[in-house]
Amino acid sequence: MAIRHFKKQVQESSDSENSSSDEKSTTARDDNYSSNPMNESELHLSTKANSDSDSGKDGPDSSSSSSSSSSSSSDDEVTLHKPVFLKRKRKDEQNQPEETGENGSLVRAAYLAKALRQKQYTENIVASETSDQSILSQIIAIDDTDNTNPEQEQLQWEQRQQARLKRERQKKLDKQLLIEEQEMQRASQLSKVDDPWLKELDLNDDSNLNSFDLKASSRNRHPVNSKKDISIPARLQKGQLQLASSHTNNDTEDTEYGYIEE
């Protein structure tokens, strides 16, 4: 404990000595300034020079300390490389075949197709614009002066209506005449042998005639009995042909039955 107390006293004594020396230097400086007054600029320059000298003295130490600290920090740091991200292929790209485009033929074909589509699109736009203009011009050219003379317009409409009906009637008539002419030509070209309908009629007529002949022949073979067939009239005799006359004249009259009387 005695040693520590002694050291403290020594330190206190040294501090007191330093303070006394500083006071002496300041008093001496004040005396010098009072004896040799200086300008503010000179004083500023002197203080700046002192500060530069102090920094020059401390410079190597500071640079050495900074270099040592940087070297130690560089040793502690670990170098990290920049990450590289790889793109994953899509499913549709995987399914597609690989393009061998050394000469760029596929790229050129795609470019030409795109240019062709663009050209077609522009042509369609131009065509639509021209069609719109033509439609607009037709709309503008429509005669909308119907209200100027309604009676005359009504009369003209009736005339147009009659003309339309006449044209339709004439068309129907021409069509009917054409059909009739075609039928006549077809009938003239066909013969009875070629026409199945006429052939069928001929067959029916032949069958009817054959049946009639068969009936007549059977009737001739079997004579009709007069007692049974009462409906068949008997043949008249010559004396029965003379009609009773109310006239007493015996002369024959010129009548339609005169040849019978003779």
Curated annotation (Swiss-Prot):
UniProt feature, compositional bias: Low complexity: 61-73, 151-160
GO cellular component: spliceosomal complex
Feature: compositional bias, Polar residues: 239-249
Record bears the keyword Hydrolase: no
Keyword Cell membrane belongs to the record: no
Family to which this protein belongs: Belongs to the SPP381 family.
Protein name listed in UniProt: Pre-mRNA-splicing factor SPP381
Protein encoded by which gene: SPP381
